């Protein structure tokens, strides 16, 4: 992908994302699993590229993300890294690869060697010691709270989280504990918009929403969902950005623009308590 290199384009860093949050500029994030789409997302101004374990669904045809292995994540991270020039590259720690802080470090180090600049892991305040352990060893962390797909069986399915007073209070505790442990980014999935706004307001780090309303610091979607090439029923928070667009590039640019101007997510993509 050397033909895409442009020395005038500035690299997106964690401090850059923090500055965007403080300035009120929305952050656009999308998934990618190969070098071609990675290069296209980067070229279209996507600030954060996520190598998600969602590859289990959209690349491997799995029903859940649970079968995805660390080896799968390393391979796809390497591919995405080769296509990316400026976006911040985040990779998921897959199911079963962070049972202890020490094991989490081994897994995260493998992803960092493959080209990740930050790792994402799913869980609440119980993960704070692991996050602290990673951050102290120079591994930036994005935490993922709310609906955590790796916990699909424990949660009883893909359900909106934080709908009761008790679960909403726990989500707030989770977010604060993970920030205090050193997380520099938090993804909130399938959370009522009002609750996500409250969590965002109580934190000093950026939040990225997926089905969490417009008041998060930014938004993320699975690429195959937003360009409408993944068959089957779509989640409520998905919008088909290919509609009315002449190309995938145009759809990605439309997504970035909609995130930036706050028109996505709209009310129809949002959950209420």
Curated annotation (Swiss-Prot):
As its record notes, the protein acts as a catalyst of: 3-methyl-2-oxobutanoate + (6R)-5,10-methylene-5,6,7,8-tetrahydrofolate + H2O = 2-dehydropantoate + (6S)-5,6,7,8-tetrahydrofolate
User: Is Lipid biosynthesis included in the keywords of this UniProt record?
Assistant: no
Q: Which domain of life is it from?
A: Bacteria
Q: Where in the cell is it found?
A: Cytoplasm
- Record keywords, A-Z: Cytoplasm, Magnesium, Metal-binding, Pantothenate biosynthesis, Transferase
Q: Which residues bind Mg(2+)?
A: 53, 92, 122
Q: Which residues bind 3-methyl-2-oxobutanoate?
A: 53-54, 92, 120
Cofactor binding mode and count: Binds 1 Mg(2+) ion per subunit.
Q: Which pathway or pathways does this protein act in?
A: Cofactor biosynthesis; (R)-pantothenate biosynthesis; (R)-pantoate from 3-methyl-2-oxobutanoate: step 1/2
Function as written in the Swiss-Prot or TrEMBL entry: Catalyzes the reversible reaction in which hydroxymethyl group from 5,10-methylenetetrahydrofolate is transferred onto alpha-ketoisovalerate to form ketopantoate.
- Name of the protein described by the UniProt record: 3-methyl-2-oxobutanoate hydroxymethyltransferase
**Gene name of the record:** panB
């Amino acid at each position: 992908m050397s033909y895409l290199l442009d020395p005038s384009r500035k690299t997106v860093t964690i401090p850059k994302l923090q500055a965007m949050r403080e300035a009120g500029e929305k952050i656009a994030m999308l998934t990618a699993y190969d070098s071609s789409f990675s290069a296209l997302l980067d070229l279209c101004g996507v600030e954060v590229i996520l190598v998600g374990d969602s590859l289990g669904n959209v690349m491997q045809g799995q029903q859940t993300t649970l079968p995805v292995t660390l080896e799968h994540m390393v391979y796809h991270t390497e591919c995405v890294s080769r296509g990316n020039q400026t976006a911040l590259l985040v990779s998921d720690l897959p199911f079963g690869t962070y049972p202890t802080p020490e094991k989490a470090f081994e897994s995260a180090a493998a992803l960092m060697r493959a080209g990740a600049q930050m790792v994402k892991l799913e869980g609440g305040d119980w993960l704070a010691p692991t996050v602290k352990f990673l951050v102290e060893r120079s591994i930036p962390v994005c935490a993922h709270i709310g609906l955590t797909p790796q916990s699909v069986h424990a949660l009883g399915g893909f359900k909106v989280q934080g709908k009761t007073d008790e679960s909403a209070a726990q989500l707030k505790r989770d977010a604060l504990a993970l920030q205090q442990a050193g997380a520099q980014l938090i993804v909130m999935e399938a959370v009522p918009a009002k609750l996500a706004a409250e969590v965002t307001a109580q934190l000093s780090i950026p939040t990225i929403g997926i089905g969490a309303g417009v008041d998060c610091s930014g938004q993320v979607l699975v690429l195959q969902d937003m360009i409408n090439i993944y068959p089957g029923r779509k989640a409520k928070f998905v919008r088909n950005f290919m509609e009315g667009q002449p190309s995938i590039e145009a759809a990605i640019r439309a997504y970035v623009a909609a995130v930036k101007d706050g028109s996505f997510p709209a009310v129809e993509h949002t959950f209420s308590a």
